[in-house]
Amino acid sequence: MPGLKITLLQQPLVWMDGPANLRHFDRQLEGITGRDVIVLPEMFTSGFAMEAAASSLAQDDVVNWMTAKAQQCNALIAGSVALQTESGSVNRFLLVEPGGTVHFYDKRHLFRMVDEHLHYKAGNARVIVEWRGWRILPLVCYDLRFPVWSRNLNDYDLALYVANWPAPRSLHWQALLTARAIENQAYVAGCNRVGSDGNGCHYRGDSRVINPQGEIIATADAHQATRIDAELSMAALREYREKFPAWQDADEFRLW
């Protein structure tokens, strides 16, 4: 059964400067080989800016760059960007394969405390991406607080979060990532940014990968621009879910 080698890039972002951010990640991705999935933070071309979509790089430009990086690294490249679409502005999580196939998920839960819901259109569909034998559920930042949306119906193996999660609530980030892994009996990975943004908001990072029993198998140092690597085991995941099949006793409800 295939394992999954995942890399999280915990990095600062240049405020509202798409080309500068792409150049930064060009440098971070240089020389990375032998990975299956490489993850960048939420809104990696701009930082978490409410006006980002209006002045953002075009989706085609971002996708072309991600495709080139996916081919270079022979890996799925994943991260969210602010985009202007025909139906409105979205916070779109893009997952791009080396062959050019593009998967996307539009952030469902918009952070009203900074009026994200007034600037962006919420997504309305869960997406499962199948990649190299793994089923991946992409989610974005504030989605983490809403467990029904990430409820595992035995339809995914890895919940993958990207975020701009502020330092004052870092305890919530760490606790909720662990909770999502335990309750869903799945791997969870969360890639957060570091540094400060144009609004003076500070970010610790605390990016991590957690196994289905809630054990942290890789974690990034707080406030450090770094990368972390982990290898996920499908055999271990299946063995645990078979030996402790709590998912079979889940309440029968569905809200989407």
Swiss-Prot record:
Residues 4-234 form the CN hydrolase domain. SUPFAM superfamilies: Carbon-nitrogen hydrolase (SSF56317). One of its GO terms (molecular function) is omega-amidase activity. Pfam families: CN_hydrolase. Its EC number is 3.5.1.3. The active site is at residues 42, 107, 141. It comes from the Bacteria. CDD domains: Xc-1258_like. It catalyses: a monoamide of a dicarboxylate + H2O = a dicarboxylate + NH4(+). Keywords: Hydrolase. NCBIfam families: PRK10438.1. PANTHER family: OMEGA-AMIDASE YAFV. Belongs to the carbon-nitrogen hydrolase superfamily. NIT1/NIT2 family. Hydrolyzes alpha-ketoglutaramate (a-KGM) to alpha-ketoglutarate (alpha-KG) and ammonia (specific activity 6.65 umol/min/mg), has weak activity on L-glutamine, almost no activity on deaminated glutathione (dGSH) and none on glutathione. May function as a metabolite repair enzyme. This is Omega-amidase YafV. It comes from Escherichia coli (strain B / BL21-DE3).
